[in-house]
Curated annotation (Swiss-Prot):
<feature type="compositionally biased region" description="Acidic residues">
    <location>
        <begin position="926"/>
        <end position="939"/>
    </location>
</feature>
<protein>
    <recommendedName>
        <fullName>Importin-9</fullName>
    </recommendedName>
</protein>
<dbReference type="InterPro" id="IPR016024">
    <property type="entry name" value="ARM-type_fold"/>
</dbReference>
<dbReference type="Pfam" id="PF25018">
    <property type="entry name" value="HEAT_IPO9_c"/>
</dbReference>
<dbReference type="GO" id="GO:0005829">
    <property type="term" value="C:cytosol"/>
</dbReference>
<dbReference type="GO" id="GO:0006606">
    <property type="term" value="P:protein import into nucleus"/>
</dbReference>
<comment type="similarity">
    <text>Belongs to the importin beta family.</text>
</comment>
<keyword id="KW-0963">Cytoplasm</keyword>
<dbReference type="Pfam" id="PF03810">
    <property type="entry name" value="IBN_N"/>
</dbReference>
<dbReference type="InterPro" id="IPR011989">
    <property type="entry name" value="ARM-like"/>
</dbReference>
<keyword id="KW-0653">Protein transport</keyword>
<dbReference type="InterPro" id="IPR001494">
    <property type="entry name" value="Importin-beta_N"/>
</dbReference>
<dbReference type="InterPro" id="IPR056840">
    <property type="entry name" value="HEAT_IPO9_central"/>
</dbReference>
<keyword id="KW-0813">Transport</keyword>
<dbReference type="GO" id="GO:0005654">
    <property type="term" value="C:nucleoplasm"/>
</dbReference>
<feature type="region of interest" description="Disordered">
    <location>
        <begin position="921"/>
        <end position="950"/>
    </location>
</feature>
<comment type="function">
    <text>Nuclear transport receptor that mediates nuclear import of proteins. Serves as receptor for nuclear localization signals (NLS) in cargo substrates. Is thought to mediate docking of the importin/substrate complex to the nuclear pore complex (NPC) through binding to nucleoporin and the complex is subsequently translocated through the pore by an energy requiring, Ran-dependent mechanism. Mediates the import of pre-assembled proteasomes into the nucleus during the late stages of sperm development.</text>
</comment>
Length: 1018
C-alpha cells in the first residue's frame, strides 16, 4: 500500500470501515440504516477505496466480509471515479484522488488470482467498471495484466476471462486486443488435458461478447468479415469436435451447452458467418438431440430409471441441471434457425422428424406432474403461460410455434406424419399396459395446439375429423386427469367447426360439467373451467342451436365454479373470474339471473386480493362485463358502491392498501354508466372521492382519484358543475390544482393521465369554468418545474398541444403574458421542456397529438412571423466538429458544446425526426443481418412485432377513447388520414418556402439526408 495512506489515523479509519462492513451484514433494518449513513461519511475519506481494496485482498477475513467490501468498492467506483456528470458530481461530492485511483488499480488485479471464484468474479467486474473510463489512457498496463493472467493457473485464467466478458471495447481496442486474446482463448479451450471443464467453459464464454463487439464496432463489412473468418476458421472445427464427443469425463454437458450458445449467438446476430458451417453443425446437433432423448424420457419424463447423472453443490457442478440446460439450449438454437430467413431452409426438409422429436421433449415429466398434484396454482401457472421457470417443455412449445409461424400450412403434412408415428407408438404402449402411454398423447395434443390458427382457417390438409375422433375417444380414460383435461380443452378450441353436431357437443359439455364435480381431481376440475372458457371464446359470435345449447349449460357450470371457489388461491381464482367474465359476456339473460351470486363473489375477491394485480385485473374485467349489461349495472352499483365508499372513508395505515384499487373499480363502474348519474354516485361516491384525495398522502390514491373524476366529468359534466350550487367545480379545481398539480407534491401525483384529465375539464366544462381555466394552466406550468419522469412531462405537454390545435390564439396569448417559473415567458419554458423530449414521447395518441400540434405551431409561426414565437430560443447540445480526440467515456463530455437556435428551427428539426419515426412505424421492420441476403420466398415470415415503446400501449383500455379524441381533433385541423403522409406533404411543401434556406443551414447531415432523400423522393 502507498506510504501516504499508512499512519495511525489510516489504521483507525480502516478498522472503522471493517466494523461498518460487518454491520452491513446484519439483518436488523435499524442497524443497516445507521450503517448506510456512516458509510456515506466514510466515502469522503481519502483512503476509503484503498482500504476496501486491501480488505478484499486479505484472505484472513471471512468471505461475506470480503464480498460486501467488493460491493461497496464497486459502488464507490461508480459514484466517485469520474465527475463528467454534473448530476453525479452534485450528488456524490468528493471524487477519488489520482493517487487513490493508482493505488486501487495496483491492488485489484491481485484479486484475479484469488482461490475463491466469487471473489475473482466480483473483482473482475470492478476492474471492468474502472477500465470503462481509465483504459487505455490511465491504465495502459491492464492488458498486459490480463495476458499474464491468461498464462497463469486456472484461478487467474478464470479471473481474466471474467474481466474480458464484462469489458467494454471500442473500435481500436477490438482491433488491438482481439488478435492477442483469441489465440489465448483457443489455447485454453483446446487444452483438455491441462485445464478443467470449468476453465475451458470460461474461455468459450469470451466469444459471445467478443463477436457482439466486432458486429457493433467494425462497421466496414470487409474488415469485419476478415476478422470473423480468421476466428471461426480456427474455432469451428474444435467447437464441433468437442460437441460431437461421446459423453464422459472429458466432455460434460456444461461445455456442450456453452458451445451451442455460441452457435445460437451467431445464428441470431451474425448468420452469414455461420452459414458456411451449417451443413456440418446441424447433423452433430441433430445426433445429440436424438441420442439424449431416450435418457431424457426414462430419467425425467417417466422416471423409470435412476438418473446416472451426478449431482453437485453448485449449479455448474450439477450434471442433472446441465443435462436439462443442454436440451433447452439445443431447442433454442433450433428456434433461432427457424426464425432466421437465411438459415431456415436448412431444416425445411426434415420438419416431420423435427416435430416428432420435439413432441417427445414436451411430454409431461413426473416432477411436473407431482408439482401439479400438490399445488393447483402451479398447474394454472404452467398451463396458462408456461410458468416463470424455463423448462424443456416450454422450449419445445416455442419450437413448434416457430414452425407454425414460419412455415404455416406447409408444416401441416409433416405434423400429421409425426402425429401418426406417435399415435402408433402410444397404441402399442397402451396395449403393453405401460402406465405412461398417455403422456405422448397429451404431448401430441399440446403440439397440435401450436398450429390451431392454420387448422381453424381451413386452408390446410389437416384431417380434423380424424384428429377430433381420436381426442374424443380419450375422454374415457378418467384415470389420467391431465390427459382428459387436455382432451376436453382441445375439443373446446375447435368447437366452432361444423363437425360438431348437437349430440357430440352435448356429450362433450356433459363430460366437462361432470369433470367439475367436487370429487374429481383438481387438475380435471381446473381443466374443465379452461374448457368452458374455450367453448365460450370459440362460439361468442355463433347463433342458433349451438348457442342455445351452451346457454342451457351455463347455470350448471356456474354451480361448479362456485363450488371450486372455497380454498382456491390467486391463480385459480383469477381463472375462475375469467370464466365468469366470459359467461356474463356470452348471454345477457344468464348475466342478469346470476348477478346475485357473481357480484358478492367479485366483492369478496376484490377485498381479499387487493395486493395481487393479476387477480384484481380479472375482477375488474368481470365488473366491466357486468357494467356493460344494463340490467346488471343497477344491482351492481347498489351492492358495490357502499363497499367502495366505506373503503374511501378509511383513515390511517388501513386505508392505503385498498383505496387506489377501490377508486379503480369505481372508475370502471362510472365509465360504463349512462347519464344522468344516480344519487348513489353523485351524492355519495363523488364527495367520497374528493374527501379521500384531499386527505391522502398516497400518490397512487391521488392518481386513481384523478382518473375517477375524469370519468365523472366525461359522463355528466353538467351534473358535476351544478353539484351543490356550483361546488362541483370548486371540488374539481381543489383536487386538480392543489393536489395533483401542486409543485410542492411529488411529481408522481401527476403520473396518471393528468393531461387527459385537464383536457377533459377544459373541453367538457370550459364554458362553465370562467377564470378557473387560467388558474388551471398556471398550475400546469408550475408543475412542470424540475420534473424527471418522462410520462409526467409528456402528460403536461399534451395539454398545451391540445390547446394549440383547438385554441391557438388564446393559448399563445396566455403563454406570452404569463411568466414562467424563472421569470422567462411561459412560452419559452413550455417549449424548452417540450422540444427536448418530443422524440422520447410514447403512446400512439400522445405522440400523434403532440406532433400535429408542432406542425400547426410551426406553420403558424413561419406564416405570420409572430414575435410571440420568433423571439423564443432553444439551447441545443451539439458535437464539436473541431475536436478530433479519440472518444472514450472520460472525454466524451468535452467533445460537445451548447448552441442557441430559434425555437422554430428546433421544431423543424423535431418534425423531421418525427417523420422518420412515423414512416418507419408504417413500413416493415428493417432487414437484419439475418435477412439482408435474401428471404425464403415461400415462408410466411415473422409476425409483426412492436417496434417502438408506443406500440406496447396499443392494448390500453383508453384506446377507443383516444381514437375518438384523435378523430375529433383531426376534424378541427387540416390533418386527415395517416400522420406520416401528412408530415411528408408538410415537409415537402416547406422545402419550396422562401424561409426554407434559413432553416436548412441549421440542419445536421443526418437531418438533411432524411429531408432530401426520404421526403423529397416520395
Amino acid at each position: 500500500m502507498s506510504l501516504q495512506f499508512q499512519n495511525d489515523c489510516g489504521d483507525s479509519v480502516k478498522q472503522a470501515i471493517i466494523e461498518e462492513l460487518q454491520n452491513l451484514l446484519s439483518s436488523d433494518t435499524g442497524v443497516l440504516q445507521q450503517t448506510e449513513k456512516r458509510i456515506k461519511q466514510l466515502e469522503y475519506t481519502e483512503g476509503y477505496g484503498v482500504y476496501l481494496s486491501e480488505i478484499i485482498m486479505n484472505q484472513a477475513h471471512e468471505l461475506p466480509l470480503r464480498q460486501i467490501a467488493i460491493v461497496m468498492l464497486t459502488r464507490y467506483v461508480e459514484n466517485h471515479w469520474t465527475d463528467d456528470d454534473d448530476v453525479k458530481r452534485k450528488a456524490n461530492g468528493c471524487m477519488a484522488s489520482e493517487q487513490a485511483k493508482r493505488t486501487i488499480r495496483n491492488i485489484l488485479p491481485n484479486g484475479l488470482y484469488d482461490p475463491n471464484s466469487k471473489i475473482r468474479s466480483s473483482v473482475a467486474h470492478t476492474i471492468s467498471t474502472i477500465a470503462a473510463t481509465d483504459y487505455p489512457h490511465c491504465w495502459a498496463e491492464l492488458f498486459d495484466i490480463i495476458v499474464k493472467c491468461l498464462g497463469g493457473n486456472e484461478d487467474s485464467i478464470h479471473g481474466a476471462m471474467q474481466v474480458l466478458q464484462d469489458f467494454s471495447y471500442d473500435v481500436e481496442q477490438i482491433k488491438e486486443l482481439g488478435p492477442v486474446v483469441i489465440p489465448e482463448v483457443y489455447r485454453i479451450f483446446d487444452s483438455e488435458q491441462n485445464y478443467s471443464i470449468k476453465t475451458r467453459v470460461s474461455a468459450i464464454r469470451i466469444l459471445k461478447p467478443l463477436f457482439a463487439s466486432i458486429a457493433a464496432l467494425i462497421t466496414n463489412k470487409e474488415e469485419q468479415s476478415t476478422m470473423m473468418s480468421s476466428i471461426l476458421t480456427n474455432f469451428m472445427d474444435k467447437l464441433m469436435h468437442y460437441l460431437s464427443m461421446n459423453s464422459g469425463a472429458v466432455s460434460s454437458f456444461l461445455l456442450r451447452t456453452e458451445i451451442i450458445k455460441v452457435f445460437t449467438h451467431l445464428v441470431n446476430e451474425m448468420p452469414k458467418y455461420i452459414n458456411p458451417f451449417m451443413d456440418r453443425v446441424l447433423p452433430i446437433v441433430w445426433q445429440l438431440l436424438t441420442q439424449i432423448a431416450e435418457t431424457y424420457v426414462k430419467v425425467s419424463v417417466n422416471q423409470t430409471e435412476t438418473s446416472p447423472l451426478a449431482s453437485g453443490d453448485s449449479e455448474e457442478d450439477d450434471e442433472q441441471t446441465n443435462f436439462q440446460s443442454l436440451i433447452i439450449q439445443i431447442l433454442e438454437f433450433i428456434n433461432c434457425i427457424l426464425t432466421c430467413n437465411k438459415l431456415r431452409g436448412s431444416i425445411k426438409n426434415v420438419l416431420a422428424d423435427l416435430i416428432y422429436i420435439t413432441i417427445v421433449y414436451i411430454q409431461l415429466s413426473e416432477e411436473q406432474l407431482e408439482d401439479w398434484h400438490d399445488d393447483p396454482e402451479k398447474f394454472v401457472d404452467d398451463e396458462d403461460d408456461g410458468g416463470v421457470e424455463l423448462t424443456v417443455r416450454m422450449c419445445g412449445r416455442d419450437v413448434l410455434l416457430a414452425i407454425n409461424d414460419e412455415f404455416g400450412a406447409n408444416a401441416i403434412q409433416p405434423l400429421q406424419e409425426a402425429l401418426g408415428r406417435h399415435f402408433s407408438v402410444a397404441d402399442a404402449e397402451k396395449a403393453a399396459n405401460n402406465p405412461n402411454w398417455w403422456k405422448i398423447q397429451e404431448a401430441c395434443m399440446d403440439a397440435v395446439h401450436a398450429f390451431r390458427d392454420v387448422i381453424l382457417a381451413g386452408d390446410s390438409t389437416f384431417d380434423l375429423l380424424n384428429y377430433l375422433t381420436i381426442v374424443r375417444n380419450l375422454l374415457v380414460h378418467q384415470e389420467s386427469p391431465p390427459l382428459v383435461g387436455r382432451a376436453l380443452w382441445t375439443l373446446s378450441i375447435y368447437s366452432k367447426s361444423d363437425l360438431y353436431n348437437p349430440q357430440m357437443l352435448t356429450e362433450i359439455l356433459d363430460v366437462t360439467l361432470c369433470s367439475l364435480s367436487p370429487e374429481k381431481s383438481h387438475i380435471l376440475r381446473i381443466s374443465a373451467v379452461r374448457t368452458l372458457n374455450g367453448f365460450l371464446q370459440a362460439n361468442e359470435t355463433i347463433d342458433g342451436e349451438k348457442r342455445t345449447l351452451l346457454v342451457s349449460k351455463l347455470p350448471g357450470f356456474l354451480d361448479g365454479i362456485m363450488a371450486l371457489v372455497p380454498g382456491s388461491k390467486a391463480a385459480v381464482l383469477a381463472l375462475l373470474m375469467e370464466a365468469l367474465t366470459f359467461m356474463v359476456k356470452f348471454d345477457a339473460e344468464f348475466a342478469f339471473a346470476s348477478q346475485a351470486k357473481i357480484t358478492p363473489l367479485a366483492i369478496a375477491v376484490f377485498l381479499k386480493y387487493t395486493e395481487d394485480p393479476y387477480v384484481l385485473e380479472t375482477v375488474q374485467d368481470l365488473i366491466k362485463a357486468l357494467c356493460q349489461r344494463k340490467e346488471c349495472l343497477g344491482p351492481l352499483q347498489e351492492k358495490f358502491i357502499p363497499t367502495i365508499v366505506s373503503i374511501l372513508g378509511l383513515t390511517g395505515a388501513a386505508s392505503t392498501e385498498k383505496q387506489d384499487i377501490a377508486l379503480d373499480v369505481l372508475n370502471t363502474i362510472v365509465r360504463y354508466t349512462e347519464p344522468p348519474l344516480n344519487n348513489s354516485l353523485l351524492e355519495t361516491a363523488f364527495p367520497a372521492i374528493i374527501n379521500c384525495v384531499l386527505h391522502t398522502d398516497d400518490h397512487a390514491v391521488m392518481v386513481a382519484g384523478g382518473e375517477c373524476l375524469r370519468s365523472f366529468i366525461n359522463v355528466s359534466p353538467e351534473q358535476i358543475c351544478s353539484y351543490k350550487n356550483g361546488e362541483g367545480i370548486n371540488c374539481i379545481m381543489q383536487v386538480v390544482a392543489t393536489v395533483l398539480l401542486n409543485p410542492m407534491n411529488s411529481e408522481m401525483t401527476a403520473a396518471g393521465q393528468i393531461g387527459r384529465l385537464v383536457i377533459t375539464i377544459i373541453t367538457k366544462m370550459g364554458s362553465m369554468l370562467g377564470q378557473n381555466v387560467d388558474m388551471l394552466l398556471k398550475a400546469v406550468i408550475s408543475k412542470m418545474q424540475n420534473l424527471e419522469c418522462l410520462k409526467v412531462i409528456m402528460n403536461l405537454v399534451l395539454i398545451f398541444a391540445h390547446l394549440f390545435l383547438t385554441q391557438m390564439d388564446a393559448v399563445l396569448n396566455f403563454l406570452s403574458t404569463v411568466p414562467g417559473p424563472n421569470g422567462e415567458p411561459a412560452m419559452q419554458f413550455v417549449l424548452t421542456n417540450w422540444l427536448s423530449r418530443q422524440n422520447s414521447f410514447f403512446g400512439n395518441y400522445e405522440r400523434k397529438v403532440t406532433t400535429m400540434a408542432l406542425c400547426k405551431l410551426f406553420e403558424y409561426g413561419v406564416a405570420t412571423q409572430d414575435n410571440r414565437l420568433t423571439t423564443i430560443t432553444f439551447k441545443e447540445l451539439v458535437d464539436d466538429p473541431t475536436d478530433t480526440r479519440r472518444r472514450t467515456r472520460s472525454v466524451a463530455a468535452t467533445t460537445q458544446k451548447w448552441v442557441t437556435i430559434p425555437a422554430l428551427v428546433k421544431i423543424f428539426k423535431v418534425l423531421i425526426s418525427e417523420y422518420q419515426h412515423f414512416q418507419e412505424g408504417k413500413s416493415d421492420e428493417p432487414l437484419t443481418d439475418s435477412e439482408e441476403d435474401g428471404d425464403d420466398e415461400d415462408a410466411p415470415g415473422n409476425p409483426d412485432k412492436p417496434r417502438y415503446i408506443s406500440d406496447l400501449f396499443e392494448s390500453d383500455e383508453d384506446n377507443a377513447e383516444d381514437e375518438q379524441l384523435l378523430q375529433e381533433l383531426l376534424k378541427e385541423t387540416n390533418y386527415q388520414g395517416d400522420i406520416a403522409d401528412n408530415l411528408q406533404k408538410f415537409l415537402t411543401t416547406f422545402t419550396q418556402n422562401e424561409h426554407f434556406p434559413t432553416f436548412y443551414e441549421h440542419l445536421t447531415e443526418g437531418e438533411r439526408l432524411i429531408l432530401l432523400s426520404k421526403v423529397q423522393q416520395k
